[in-house]
Amino acid sequence: ADCLAHLKLCKKNNDCCSKKCSRRGTNPEQRCR
């Protein structure tokens, strides 16, 4: 699922977020803040 350009895909819960995704170390973006 692709997100609109101004949204970010958070891979853990597969949500499109208007806020930044929380990260853990060097892992990919995980979830919405």
Curated annotation (Swiss-Prot):
Free-text domain note: The presence of a 'disulfide through disulfide knot' structurally defines this protein as a knottin.
Site for Essential for stimulation of [3H]ryanodine binding to RYR1, residues: 31, 33
Subcellular location: Secreted
InterPro entries: Scorpion_calcine
Chief location bin: secreted
Disulfide bonding pattern of the chain: 3-17, 10-21, 16-32
Protein family per UniProt: Belongs to the scorpion calcin family.
MF terms (GO), sorted A to Z: calcium channel inhibitor activity; toxin activity
Annotated tissue distribution: Expressed by the venom gland.
Start and end residues of each stretch annotated as Essential for stimulation of [3H]ryanodine binding to RYR1: 23-24
Any one of the GO CC terms: extracellular region
Function: This toxin stabilizes ryanodine receptor 1 (RyR1) opening in a long-lasting subconductance state (60% of the full conductance state). Furthermore, it triggers calcium release from sarcoplasmic vesicles (31 nM are enough to induce a sharp release, and 65% of the total calcium is released after toxin (100 nM) addition) probably by acting as a cell-penetrating peptide (CPP). In addition, it has been shown to dose-dependently stimulate ryanodine binding to RyR1 (EC(50)=3.7 nM).
Protein name per its UniProtKB record: Vejocalcin
High-level lineage: Eukaryota, Metazoa, Ecdysozoa, Arthropoda, Chelicerata
Entry annotated with the keyword Secreted: yes
Top-level taxon in the UniProt lineage: Eukaryota
Keywords of this entry: Calcium channel impairing toxin, Disulfide bond, Ion channel impairing toxin, Knottin, Neurotoxin, Ryanodine-sensitive calcium-release channel impairing toxin, Secreted, Toxin
